[in-house]
Structures are given as structure tokens and as C-alpha cells.
Amino acid sequence: MSDWKVPAAEAMFMLSHLVWLYFVWAIWSFWRRRNKASLAFRLLLAGAFVWMRFVEPNWIARQETAIAIGAPARIVLVSDLHLGAYKGADFVERVVEQINAERADCVLIAGDFLYAPRLPLDPLFAPLKGIKLPVYAVLGNHDRNEFGPSLTEAREIELVDQALQRAGVRLIENQIVNCGGVAVTGIGDRWSGREDARVARAYKGDKPLVALTHNPDTAPDLNAPAGKLVLAAHTHGGQIRIPWLYKKVLPVSGPFDAGLHAPLKPGDPPVFVTTGLGETALPMRLFNPPVIDVLQLH
């Protein structure tokens, strides 16, 4: 992320607190004009803003989904923390606390750890050390080509990778690891030009293969006969999930939204898309709280 976007995101975050002045103005206006309908409308508008800005983005939901793939595994799936301008280590601590309450085989993180962060990164990632399960991850587009402050791309990648490693997070792009009764492989981010599914396509192991990637648009091009399931993120479920409107802003070309999607064509794996934990652009969510997904594979 370029230099100007970092202070811009921080300014947007701080200016949103001015809503409290709007409350004062609405009440003062009522006492001056005694217009109850006008007051009700203004308070409703301000209340909706407060919910979207201050309540829902800080409410961490839990969602459990059973998926049949032919082998048992219990996976905690999270993504899109977007640490930096809007969320920090205190939010991660709450996420880690909830993860540690789960009985699972591993934790998978589907990318986009960052959004307009300031260096150093270690304080943001430090709470991840507290996760008591094996943690495997891939990176997303905001971790690769929209990082910022302005650094060379190679240096950016090195900083992110090393900071996550120090926090106990193992990046598994083009690798295979075991999680319960399944094998998991990581595929790099599509938008960052790092999508490479050769390891998945060459897999011939006995365990069903689960592919972890950031962008669900990777799934139709996977062409991995052993692949039984793709886990992805990126969409935020629209973030501000206003019915009928949010689908117009989903950052995907395929029919991917949130939750479990059936195979697009025979031979394709199903795709599960988590709606993530953080926010980009506007620091708001609606009808779509941050979520920790618990997947019971069987």
C-alpha cells in the first residue's frame, strides 16, 4: 500500500468517532424544534452507523460447518485479519482466546494479515504465538502487493514472512502438511501473481487433499484430481452485507460469496469461503460479523 494510504486509512478510522457529535446535534435540534419524527430518523441513522462501525466489527462470531470429504479432521479456519489501520494486537488476542477454546487438529489462516500497517510488524503478530495448535497459512493480496509503507516488493515479502515465522505461523505455499486425517497444501495468491498449483496437481498421497488459498477464483483452475476441498477467503462476504447490493462489490469473478459452494463442474472440488475477521476501505460491517469458522471434515 502506498505511503498516502496509510495515514488516509488512519484518518478515516479516527474521523468516524465524530458520530458522537452527531448525536449531540440531533438532540439539540430536537429541543430547539420539537420535531420528534426528525429526531427519530436522525437517531436511527446514527444508531445504524454506531452498530456498523463500533459494534459489529468487534463482535467475533463462531460458525461450525460439517463437510464430507472422506476423512476426519477438525479445522479452525480464519482469514483477513487486516491488522494495521483498523485492528491491532488487542483484537488478535481475543481471536486467539476463542481459537484456544476449540478442540481441533490445526488452525488454517487464508491470508490478508495486513491492511495499512506501520512497521514493525512483530507487535501486531505477537499474540499469534499463543495459539496452542499447529498454525499453517498462506498470504493474500494485501500481504504481497499492497503492503506499505513504501518498500521494494522483495523486502516487503521478506518482512511479512519473517514476522509471521517469529509468531509461530508456518507458511505452506507449495508445501504439504498433515492435519488430522487430511493433507493440506497452500496455493499462493492469484492477484499477487503467485498462484501455483503444481504441488496440488502432483499429489498422490493416501489422505484426501485440502487446498488452502486466499482467492476462491483459484478453485476452478486447480485441476488437481486428488483435491477434495478448497478453503478460501478474500470476499469478506461483502463486508457491508446489504441484501441484493453487496454481491455487486464482491472482488471475485466466479460465483463465490460465503460458506460452502458446490463444485462448479464435474471433477471440481467444493469451495468453502470464510468471510474473515477484519475490514478494508470502510472500517464497518453489517449483517456479517467477523467470524471464526470451525470445519468438521468427515
Walk through the language-model features, giving the residues of each:
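Conserved beta-sheet core of the metallophosphoesterase superfamily
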Residues: 216-296
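Solvent-exposed loop/turn segments at secondary-structure junctions
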Residues: 83, 113-116, 141-145, 177, ...
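Beta-strand-turn-beta hairpins that frame and shape the catalytic cleft
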Residues: 66-76, 169, 176-185, 205-206, ...
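Active-site neighborhood of phospho(di)ester-bond hydrolases with catalytic His/Asp-centered motifs
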Residues: 77-79, 106-112, 134-141, 172-174, ...
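Membrane-embedded segments
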Residues: 71-170
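Extended recognition/assembly regions associated with phosphoester-bond processing machinery
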Residues: 13-16, 20-23, 61-66, 201-220, ...
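Non-catalytic terminal accessory segments
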Residues: 1-61
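Binuclear metal-dependent hydrolase catalytic cores centered on His/Asp/Glu-rich metal-binding motifs
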Residues: 147-169, 173-176, 180-213, 219-221, ...
